[in-house]
């Protein structure tokens, strides 16, 4: 069957993450995967599994989440972007829909993944339009928040969500960048941290930002980070 690659953007505030979550004797929780599969079923008249590149947690947003599904030959060349966007809620959008070889897999073909985390450096006031998209962490010393010791292939067990059951907690962080770079301009209240890796553990980036913010607040020293990682114990790292 022809394979379709979807690039999906969404505001995750109202959703319980990406993956469908069945409940006994109740309707599934609203998730991105479930909502998209509902729309596909409306088009095809049958339920088709939509494979995502990875799971996202409740409330997480996406600019380019990749997924794939197999569709009948008779429907392969229809305008899937228009068809799905007509059916989907406004906070879930198909940015692109293209046919790909059947060897493509949204998860297994991924070379790297990118995650952004936005900080708002004031607890006094957060603009309402930014509230769902930033962590209002308050004032931090950005110059202390060095992230070099997080780069490379490491065991990130100390920064995974409790209860995560995986074959390995080793991941490779390829780059970490901050916008704006260098000393903050006067009056700057928003920072964006961008992480690129071969993959992420559940809530790994959230917990990493909790660690960096603790350093920025002076609760930890930058030199503490390697020891926290080496401990491979979530209880050692700051709670978020």
List PLM regions with ranges.
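Structured-RNA-binding interfaces characteristic of tRNA pseudouridine synthases
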Residues: 1-240
């Amino acid at each position: 069957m022809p394979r379709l690659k979807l690039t999906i953007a969404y505001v995750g505030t109202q959703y319980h993450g990406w993956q469908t979550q069945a409940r006994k004797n109740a309707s599934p929780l609203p998730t991105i995967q479930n909502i998209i599969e509902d729309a596909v079923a409306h088009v095809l008249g049958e339920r088709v599994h939509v494979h995502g590149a990875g799971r996202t947690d409740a409330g997480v947003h996406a600019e380019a989440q990749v997924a794939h599904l197999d569709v009948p030959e008779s429907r392969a060349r229809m305008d899937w972007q228009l068809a799905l966007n007509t059916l989907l809620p406004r906070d879930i959008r198909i940015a692109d829909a293209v046919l790909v070889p059947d060897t493509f897999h949204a998860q297994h073909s991924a070379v790297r993944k990118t995650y952004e985390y936005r900080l708002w450096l004031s607890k006094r006031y957060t603009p309402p339009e930014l509230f769902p998209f930033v962590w209002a962490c308050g004032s931090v010393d950005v110059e202390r928040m060095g992230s070099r010791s997080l780069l490379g292939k490491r065991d990130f067990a100390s920064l995974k969500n409790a209860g995560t059951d995986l074959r390995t907690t080793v991941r490779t962080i390829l780059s970490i960048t901050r916008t704006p770079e260098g000393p903050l301009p006067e009056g700057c209240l928003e920072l964006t941290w961008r992480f690129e890796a071969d993959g992420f553990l559940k809530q790994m980036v959230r917990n990493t930002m909790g660690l960096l913010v603790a350093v920025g607040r002076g609760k930890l020293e930058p030199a503490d980070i390697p020891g926290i990682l080496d401990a491979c114990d979530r209880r050692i790292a700051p709670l978020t």
